[in-house]
Amino acid sequence: MIERGKFRSLTLINWNGFFARTFDLDELVTTLSGGNGAGKSTTMAAFVTALIPDLTLLHFRNTTEAGATSGSRDKGLHGKLKAGVCYSVLDVVNSRHQRVLVGVRLQQVAGRDRKVDIKPFAIQGLPSAILPTQLLTETLNDRQARVLSLNELKDKIDTMEGVQLKQFNSITDYHSLMFDLGVVARRLRSASDRSKYYRLIEASLYGGISSAITRSLRDYLLPENGGVRKAFQDMEAALRENRMTLEAIRVTQSDRDLFKHLISEATNYVAADYMRHANERRIHLDQALELRRELFSSRKQLAAEQYKHVHMARELSEHAGAEGDLETDYQAASDHLNLVQTALRQQEKIERYEADLEELQIRLEEQSEVVAEAAEQQEENEARAEAAELEVDELKSQLADYQQALDVQQTRAIQYQQALTALERARELCHLPDLSADSADEWLDTYQAKEQEATERLLSLEQKMSVAQTAHSQFEQAYQLVASINGPVSRAEAWDVARELLRDASQQRHLAEQVQPLRMRLSELEQRLREQQDAERLLAEFCKRQGKNYDPEDLEALNDELEARIAALSDSVSQAGEQRMTLRQELEQIQSRVKTLTSHAPAWLAAQNSLNQISEQSGETFESGQQVTEYLQQLLEREREAIVERDEVGARKRAVDEEIERLSQPGGAEDARLNALAERFGGVLLSEIYDDVSFDDAPYFSALYGPSRHAIVVPDLSRVRDLLDGLEDCPEDLYLIEGDPQSFDDSVFSVEELEKAVVVKVAERQWRYSRFPSVPLFGRAARESRIESLHAEREALSERYATLSFDVQKTQRLHQAFSRFVGQHLAVAFEADPEAEIRKLNTRRSEIERAISQHENDNQQQRVQFEQAKEGVAQLNRLLPRLSLLADDSLADRVEEIQERLAEAQDAARFLSQHGKALAKLEPVASVLQSDPEQFDQLKQDYEQARQTQRDARQQAFALSEVVQRRAHFSYSDSAQMLNGNTDLNEKLRQRLEQAEAERTRAREALRTHAAKLSQYHQVLASLKSSFDTKKELLGDLQRELQDIGVRADAGAEERARQRRDELHTRLSNNRSRRNQLEKQLTLCEAEMDNLTRSLKRLERNYHEMREQVVSAKAGWCAVMRMVKDNGVERRLHRRELAYHSGDDLRSMSDKALGALRLAVADNEHLRDVLRLSEDPKRPERKIQFFVAVYQHLRERIRQDIIRTDDPVEAIEQMEIELGRLTEELTSREQKLAISSRSVANIIRKTIQREQNRIRMLNQGLQSVSFGQVNSVRLNVNVRESHATLLEVLAEQHEQHQDLFNSNRLTFSEALAKLWQRLNPQIDMGQRTAQTIGEELLDYRNYLEMEVEVNRGSDGWLRAESGALSTGEAIGTGMSILVMVVQSWEDESSRLRGKDISPCRLLFLDEAARLDARSIATLFELCERLQMQLIIAAPENISPEKGTTYKLVRKVFQNHEHVHVVGLRGFAAPPADALPGPAEVS
């Protein structure tokens, strides 16, 4: 028999009136006796505080402040403590004889709220010799002690070996320890449990029938059927979860396409944009690098162009300067040529004019003679004409005068006067004052003779003049020739000068004959000199081009060197061309190969993805296609093995399910037919009677009853006999035992217990030996243990079955994946990585491009060197033939010498050219210069004088002839004389007039004809003179101009000048062409530099923009990559095969996916908003956020009980594996989990029946309890009528309400609530839900009504109410009920606590003076029978006969208050020494 634990003592430290007081507690009743204020309630409060240290519950009423608020309420504890550290400690010895101190440290908290700080603790392993006061205080001297703080107490205990102090931060942990050690009867897990326990203590403390307990007796007495309720709840939860899972499967099946579509489109949408950005980033990086290369190349090219520009500008400036000089030289040469040509033309003109002048001179002389003759003849004709004219005029005037005289007298006078006038004129001309008309005739003859004489003399002089003029003209001609050759010279020196000139002329002719040879020699030397100058210029240019000065003698060696260099460079260039061709061919091959690999890469990447997938799924690494096919065969074998193992596990799981179902039968009946037979026979299953047997006792009873442990216990076997006839629906062996089901015991067998076995004497000659089963099934605890283990096994089997099913499905899908891989990708999967080869080829291509670029640069340099060498050789080819010229230093001197000789010869030739004809003319006539014909002037003067004399004589003769002709008029002295002779005179006059007019006409005609001739002669002469003078003047001008020109106009001058001009023109043209070429090149260079500068600026701008774009894109890309890696979606988004698509294709792919996504997420506001935000092209990370949001959304929609992954993509793969299997499994599970209404009714009925039996057992313990008029106390348990109807309908009429229980939309609890509403429509359900009502209806306690009844006097059994009982009766009745509650708690908790622990039982009773001695004795008897401790507080007049009594007296000494305690043993007890005296410790 297990000994019950006991409270040994209560220790109060530093309480009000108790400094260090230990109350030893009696094993039964401890009485605290004393007057009011003695400290009884303080002691009990300390005990209760140590038991339940919960300030939310502690409430000691006698010190409660009336009307105080809850915030400042004292709770009655603050005033019971003194300042400082206080302790309340219980010393307990449990059933294992373990000593444990449990208690609390209390301390007042300063403040107006009068709060108390409580700290629970426990001390284990303390030796029994150490008292609590010794442990909690420190003795200072004989009269003084100090209370230790909790830390000091801990330090003190740490020094004790084997002693352990535990402090608790929660009351639950504190009570858990107390329950495990058997200090409290019930595990107080929650505040509700603590509240129940405190209410029980409170009801015990203050006595009477507590309404708080009687109203909730079901909660105190009826244990919560947690197992059944939990089973229902678990079953419902399993069904609900099963249905939800099935619904989730159906939704998931419907969502699978949505998953696929959403994931596919989201992946396409985001991955395409992700890869497009990755491609663009790579392209931008490549572009940035390319721009940087172009930038550096452009800078280098610009520097080269600038250098080239400087070089060409310098060369252009040199050519421009040279061009100015050449233009000057060319212009000078052109001018010289023009001058030479002009001089030649002038010379030709001079010669032509000289010839013309000579011819004109001859013609002029001849014409002068003709004019002189014509002039003379004209003078004669004029004289005759004049005479004839005078005569005619005279005759006409005479005739007119005569005619007039005929008419008037005056006419004769006029004629007479005219005659006189003519006479006077004749006198004047002839100087004859005596001339008269009569002598006029004579004088006429005289003067005609004079005229004849003068004419003859004139002719003689003219002949002399002609001869003299000829001699004079020869002298003058010779003199003019000398003067023209030598210049002005005196006539006397003319002969000497002429002779000197003729002598020099021969020397001049000799020199002139040397002009042409000298000119040819000079032309040759000048040509050589020009060639020498050209050679020097070429040499200077060559040295300038070569950048080094060379001597002429070094040019041949340099030529050989340059030709060798040209040959080497030519070979190098040809080899470079071949090498370049080879490199370009290799580059083309690489590009072709890269193109082929690029087109092949997506298929290879798809194959690699598929290979990686099957490798991840299989956990294997495949190196060849043969390994794949071999592994495919292994998969087939593994699939067959997994299917066999799965079927075996499924069979075992079904067997376990059947066993669980069998063991879960109500009452422990393994056969459901036994329950029906028990109801039919009115008995109870033996297993149901022993349903509460402990797990440790189950093997014994199972072996004790053996095969009859499934027997039916009936009150009377005879009544059952008739029912056995015709019984068919029953087990093969049916055991019936007669006995009272309410008080059945195992006395029906004679049994002997052995080691792990029993021997049962069934009869005198029949024994049965039964060993304790290794897995007992007798009793609810054993069955529950077995069911629990079976459930664990079933869970393991289910998990194993699910695993195997999953493995089978996985293997099948893996087999399908391998089959697809073999069919689609095996041919390319194990080929070499095209991307790696592409990278190698790209590296090689870069190397080749660099090599080509370097080769081009080298080749360009070689070409430049080749062109330079070639140009040098060309220049040398022009220079080498002129090396002799370069070495000829005397050429210039020879040229100068020849030029001087040529100048002399040219001067001689020019002299001869100018004066050769004059010298030739002078040579034959030079001798005439010896004598000067001076008389020519006198002869000429005489000739002029004779001519004037002849002219005067002719005039005189004419005048005399006119007088002679008018001689008749002298006779007109009077008019009468004239009138008389008018007829004859008139006739004469007329005849004479006619003759005179005829003569005049002839004279006029002769004069006119001769005048015309003379005029013509004069015109010819004037023309000749004018022409002669003009040409002579022109000749002088031309000679002066020729002298002014200062150029030797010889025959070769023009050719030399033209050659010089043409040479300079060629050089100027070459210089201009070179300058133009340089200007064009310079313009092109400047344009190229401008283009390069603009290109450089553009490249710099583009490079900086691209670099900024790359840098900014890098930050955004880093954020994107960080987001991708943080969310683990890189594998989904980085689809390498998309890297081979163009940006437009990827953008089109993303746009198409975006359109599909808009439709797909149209009903999801969150995804729709995130998708809308992700459309911003400037925020690519939002697409990642959308992708993550899609994944998160899909993860949230993944049922983890169906699919064991968080990855939606893997979830889709697992869906295919799991959905079909789970659908089938969950459908069968739902059928198994379906709750039968009849089984629920049976379970509730059996539970109610069991609890009614337990309450009846408790009532047996209360039958002998009596208080005053109360003779007995009992608990009455009845089933409520409405609930009984519900049970009956569930058991018998459930088929009428299958619409509720077969509905998939309702849980069993909800269906039960709906049925309750159908059966009790009059009951208002309020605001409670059907689920809540159904859960209440599954709790059997709600079916029962409990009330306390007392058998009082003559009234019989009455309901226990405070108003119907006296105070003492009420206290006793309430104490009885509390004892029942404590005992019920112990029974309920027996399976939770160790089997070797029997908990302490202790109750309180304050103000026990209201009980009489009989009632107190009853309490003592109850305590003794129930092994219960009781603490009673009573006034001093109570002196119980049993137990321990403490007399408490509160005293005040010197303003110091303390309680004087005296302890006494009960009088009826065996003699014993008195307990220690009063404690005076202060």
Swiss-Prot record:
Sorted UniProt keywords: ATP-binding, Cell cycle, Cell division, Chromosome partition, Coiled coil, Cytoplasm, DNA condensation, DNA-binding, Nucleotide-binding
Biased composition (Basic and acidic residues): 1051-1066
The keyword Protein biosynthesis appears for this protein: no
Residues the entry annotates as binding ATP: G34, G35, N36, G37, A38, G39, K40, S41
Subcellular localization(s) per the UniProt record: Cytoplasm, Nucleoid
GO cellular component terms, semicolon-separated: cytoplasm; nucleoid
Biological process (GO), any one: cell division
Positions of region (Disordered): 1049-1077
Superkingdom per UniProt: Bacteria
Major place of residence: cytoplasm
Pfam families tied to this protein: MukB (PF04310), MukB_hinge (PF16330), SbcC_Walker_B (PF13558)
Quaternary structure note: Homodimerization via its hinge domain. Binds to DNA via its C-terminal region. Interacts, and probably forms a ternary complex, with MukE and MukF via its C-terminal region. The complex formation is stimulated by calcium or magnesium. Interacts with tubulin-related protein FtsZ.
Free-text comment about domains: The hinge domain, which separates the large intramolecular coiled coil regions, allows the homodimerization, forming a V-shaped homodimer.
Family: Belongs to the SMC family. MukB subfamily.
Protein name, per record: Chromosome partition protein MukB
Organism the protein comes from: Cronobacter sakazakii (strain ATCC BAA-894)
Gene name in the database record: mukB
